[in-house]
């Protein structure tokens, strides 16, 4: 949700709860979700913390169009990753033009994808991470995105298991806003 989720206040929001029972009012949490802390303040918060995973692995799923990446996302989330994040062609082009990120793009990005979905798994058991990455590769190929196909660009998955490799992609992705703001033109995406 981006911005104020005013739609959560309409009567439809009161119709059914997630468990299918009749609603008993409006859940204000839905209104607050996009407000970036501008609609309320908290005097006490209870968090459920989980330990950091011992190992993370990452798959960079390359797609020839933005829309094909978005369509594939609904399938990829069924693998239960800890994160699925988009890096689009605008971000990739800007990263190529910035000297600190150019080597990252040249090393890990194959061809000229229109979109990359960064899929992360973080299981305690390294064998389970390996199994999940294999399932990711298979799913992406089954969806029709494999470099083994004869067309000019069909996509595929680059696997990253080393912490340093993943950190380079994460740094590029997390710096996305700064990269976008570094554009020299008045028209920013």
Place the predicted regions along the sequence by residue:
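Noncatalytic alpha-helical scaffold of FAD-dependent oxidoreductases
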Residues: 1-189
């Amino acid at each position: 949700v981006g911005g104020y989720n005013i739609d959560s206040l309409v009567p439809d929001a009161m119709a059914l709860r997630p468990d299918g029972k009749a609603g008993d009012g409006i859940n204000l949490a839905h209104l607050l979700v996009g407000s970036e802390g501008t609609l309320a303040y908290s005097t006490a918060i209870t968090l459920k913390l989980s330990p950091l995973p011992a190992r993370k692995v990452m798959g960079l799923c390359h797609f020839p169009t933005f829309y094909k990446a978005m369509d594939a996302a609904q399938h990829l989330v069924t693998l239960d990753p800890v994160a699925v994040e988009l890096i689009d062609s605008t971000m990739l082009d800007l990263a190529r033009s910035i000297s600190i990120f150019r080597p990252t793009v040249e090393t890990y990005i194959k061809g000229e994808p229109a979109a990359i979905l960064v899929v992360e798994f973080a299981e305690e058991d390294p064998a389970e991470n390996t199994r999940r990455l294999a399932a990711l590769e298979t799913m992406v190929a089954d969806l029709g995105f494999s470099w083994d196909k004869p067309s000019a660009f069909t996509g595929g998955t680059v696997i990253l298991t080393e912490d340093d490799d993943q950190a380079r992609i994460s740094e590029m992705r997390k710096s996305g806003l700064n990269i976008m703001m570094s554009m020299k033109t008045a028209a920013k995406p």
